[in-house]
From Swiss-Prot:
Its biological purpose: Transcription factor that plays a role in the activation of archaeal genes transcribed by RNA polymerase. Facilitates transcription initiation by enhancing TATA-box recognition by TATA-box-binding protein (Tbp), and transcription factor B (Tfb) and RNA polymerase recruitment. Not absolutely required for transcription in vitro, but particularly important in cases where Tbp or Tfb function is not optimal. It dynamically alters the nucleic acid-binding properties of RNA polymerases by stabilizing the initiation complex and destabilizing elongation complexes.
The name this protein goes by in its record: Transcription factor E
Taxonomic lineage: Archaea, Thermoproteota, Thermoprotei, Desulfurococcales, Pyrodictiaceae
Complexes and interactors: Monomer. Interaction with RNA polymerase subunits RpoF and RpoE is necessary for Tfe stimulatory transcription activity. Able to interact with Tbp and RNA polymerase in the absence of DNA promoter. Interacts both with the preinitiation and elongation complexes.
Any Gene Ontology biological process: regulation of DNA-templated transcription
SUPFAM superfamilies hit by this protein: Winged helix' DNA-binding domain
Domain of life assignment: Archaea
Molecular functions (GO terms): DNA binding
Residue span(s) of domain HTH TFE/IIEalpha-type: 4-88
Signal peptide bounds: none
Keyword terms of this UniProt record: DNA-binding, Transcription, Transcription regulation
Comment block on domains: The winged helix domain is involved in binding to DNA in the preinitiation complex.
Family of this protein: Belongs to the TFE family.
A Pfam family hit: TFIIE_alpha
Length: 173
């Protein structure tokens, strides 16, 4: 299995959950529409779990369905497939949202100085540290200036650049 497909499965799992990933994998491997019962059989998941995963993925635009009346049972059967047409825009919008969150985090990281507890690693803004007289309210240790600030800023910048490159250089605003 290619790394791109594995990334897509991981994306589905993070966006929804592990059951949705199994359902998505079953749809991908089938390469065609599947009924809910067929998906349950292929994944080993209960039918209600399959339906919940499918509905969650449908809300996010990852899968689509069509209804068809069953000829003998006189009930509706839902046939599901991956929404290949919509996936690129869904992934791009998630990347844009992540880009915006990272930009906000970077701005905060660059503008605020943090103090950290050397014992438990809890971070406090200068104002919070001042309120506690530079003593950790949890353990009583002396708070020290966060020395990893520059490293965190550098990492955030790298992730932001990576997302901007993937988004075609267009900066999300």
């Amino acid at each position: 299995m290619s790394s791109e497909i594995e990334k897509l499965f991981t994306f589905v799992e993070k966006l929804v959950d592990s059951d949705a990933r199994k359902v998505f994998e079953a749809l991908y491997e089938a390469g065609e529409e599947l009924s809910e019962a067929d998906i349950a059989t292929k994944t080993g998941l209960k039918l209600n779990v399959v339906r919940r995963a499918l509905n969650s993925m449908a809300e996010k635009g990852l899968v689509v369905y069509r209804r068809q009346k069953h000829p003998q049972k006189n009930k509706l059967v839902f046939y599901w497939r991956i929404n290949y047409e919509g996936l690129p825009s869904i992934i791009e919008s998630r990347k844009r949202a992540a880009h915006e969150k990272l930009r906000t985090l970077l701005e905060k990281e660059e503008s605020v100085h943090y103090y950290v507890c050397p014992r438990d690693g809890t971070r406090y803004t200068f104002e919070e540290a001042l309120d506690h007289e530079f003593i950790c309210p949890r353990c009583g240790s002396m708070l020290v200036l966060d020395e990893e600030r520059e490293l965190r800023i550098q990492i955030l910048k790298q992730y932001i650049k990576m997302l901007e490159d993937e988004l075609g250089g267009a900066k999300a605003s």
